[in-house]
Amino acid sequence: MDYSIQERLENYLRAINFKNPRWIPCRVSLMPATWRKYRGKLEDIVLSHPVIFPDYREGSIDFDAIKDPGYRKGGFTDSWGCVWENIEEGLDGMVVKFPLDDWGKLDSYIPPDPIVQEERGGTPDWDKIRESLKERRSQGKLATGGLPHGSMYMRLFYLRGFENLMIDIATDDPRLEKLISMVLDYNIKFINKWLELGVDLMYFGDDLGNQDRLPISPEKFRKYLKPCYKKMFGLCREKNVYVYLHSDGHIIEIIDDLIECGVNILNPQVRANTVEGLVKNAKGKVCIDLDLDRQLFPFATPEEIRRHIKDAVEKLNSPEGGLMLIAECEPDVPLENIETICSVLEEVGGPSV
């Protein structure tokens, strides 16, 4: 089968638009900590699966390099003034100090400017980014932009603290509207910059669910968050830019809302939402980039992994398309299981973009 760059892009777009893709686009995401642990043995697996890793070249990964400060052991303060702490090199940390934990700090608080401040340090080089997008397009690749993970809902509790935000929402604290507007304005400015540069797809990530339920009721989601996503995603759709939304956690009750807001590709977790829940609430309505069960991968036998992937494909795929697969492998996943994941994905699908 032809897996050229042009064919991969055409197939990816066919999957998004339910126009009979030739194969299911599949990806395997390897965390920095996973590379640090397995090193050359992991690279051997990657090199033996060029269908899943079509652009990887031997030696192109520095096993010890951690570019994102959020993935380095220790602490740092982001552009919003949120203090992060990380106990595991190569995995993401968490916010431990919240600049707006007291409402009394809100009036004097000045949010960052995304045009001149990167969220995790540094100044964005927009000219370089513009040229990179042009180069990707000239190569027949997808020109992709995006906001940092956790840019709307999660940023609210990064600023207030999770418990405080839950109380704010439960009690309909009037000050919440000002906080939401501030974060939304930041995001709108960021999105408009990407749209000005010219992108084909915008990536958004916000973990809207807990393990087995929403953290807030669907009604509260529709009151406080849905209008934000509708505005953010609507800007993209007006420019014919695809909207990709990643969300960890259980989101079944709000999938229709997210589609209404303009999501083209939804990246939900299979364990939190179940295959059956996604068949009922998402199949045929939106392209599903299914996050395979990362909580299964560390402990399963290769045969259990095979059955898991095959079952998801059997129930969620259709000839029209609308399905992609992604497997994220943390450092607790045995090499044998990573090999199995890659092999089975090659059996059921082909490369992504």
Give each language-model segment a name.
Residues 1-36, 86, 110-353:
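Active-site loop segments of alpha/beta catalytic cores
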Residues 26, 51-58, 77-85:
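Secondary-structure transition motif
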Residues 5, 41-47, 106-109:
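Generic hydrophobic, helix-prone segments enriched in Leu/Val/Ile
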Residues 40-44, 71-76, 304-308:
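Short, surface-exposed amphipathic charged segments that create phosphate/polyanion-binding patches used
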Residues 35-69:
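Segments that shape or occlude catalytic/ligand-binding pockets
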Residues 66-118, 138-142:
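A contiguous, low-structure linker/loop signature
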